[in-house]
């Protein structure tokens, strides 16, 4: 019989002095919670302090995903349903994320004093270089909604070399005209600030339906302790300048762009017009059926798939698993061969290209997808 030998087994991760297995598990859980919550920073800029939260660690030769939220929201209420969606984890594990809160919109923000001059949207865009310098990040992929989409677009116009791509949801690149101002003033006489902001965020059909989502966000805005700050951000949005996009001109976005809007959303016409002004070789247009005014809240799965395609076209996520939009495309191409036009809008795909396929490389044409 072979002689038994004593074998000493040591832990792969030895416990700290005085640490029990139970406390080690608690420490590991606390670390995971901290990682999930991100790290919040504030930086001073020429236009005041701005707060942002960083998730993950920088990846070599990869840009940061950089988000900016809409009026009435902060980064959590605007983007958490999207970035916590299951299929999105494949993306976020490959990129560091920076979520910006507009001044005074972060959780626990004090109310600005009476007479405080809130930054314009152009000035909010001018804060972004201070954030990137603080983090030592050189390039970003921007994801913005509403006012945030405008801010990121303004930044991209001023600093094109630092923006690799933009996902712009509900962007309105135009300044308010006289008719818009008159309607806004008239609405202000009969509606509260929360009601006006809700009308900006959601369609009338959604507001009339009063779903759980609408009830949730109505409560968030109506009972916000920083409602005065929200009104200042709202006023800055309504005083925005025209971005003056011009197809074929000097004033245009130089990076790949994905425009996103919900079918019958409040900003559908504005996004369609924006699409007509951008470079068709760099722009894709995603119109999402049954998503309402905030597709990142109501259809995070479809938007995640579109985002994966967008990143793949930029040379990232090449081996990513595409599912929902792939099935939608297959059904659409089958539908296109049929005379029957009664098929659901959620299964249609139309492109200005005659290839009949989604681009696998950088965007080469304007495409419109209803999914």
From Swiss-Prot:
The keyword Nuclease does not apply. Gene3D superfamilies: alpha/beta hydrolase (3.40.50.1820). GO terms for biological process: cell differentiation; negative regulation of cytokine production; negative regulation of ERK1 and ERK2 cascade; negative regulation of vascular associated smooth muscle cell proliferation; nervous system development; regulation of platelet-derived growth factor production; regulation of vascular endothelial growth factor production; vascular associated smooth muscle cell proliferation. The keyword Protease does not apply. Its main location: cytoplasm. GO terms for cellular component: cytoplasm; Golgi apparatus; growth cone; nucleus; perinuclear region of cytoplasm. Expressed at highest levels in brain, heart and liver, and at lower levels in kidney, colon, skeletal muscle, adrenal gland, ovary and uterus (at protein level). The modification N-acetylalanine is found at residue 2. InterPro entries: AB_hydrolase_fold, NDRG. Residues 1-22, 334-371 are annotated as: Disordered. Pfam families: Ndr (PF03096). Contributes to the regulation of the Wnt signaling pathway. Down-regulates CTNNB1-mediated transcriptional activation of target genes, such as CCND1, and may thereby act as tumor suppressor. May be involved in dendritic cell and neuron differentiation. Belongs to the NDRG family. Interacts with CTNNB1. This is Protein NDRG2. It comes from Mus musculus (Mouse).
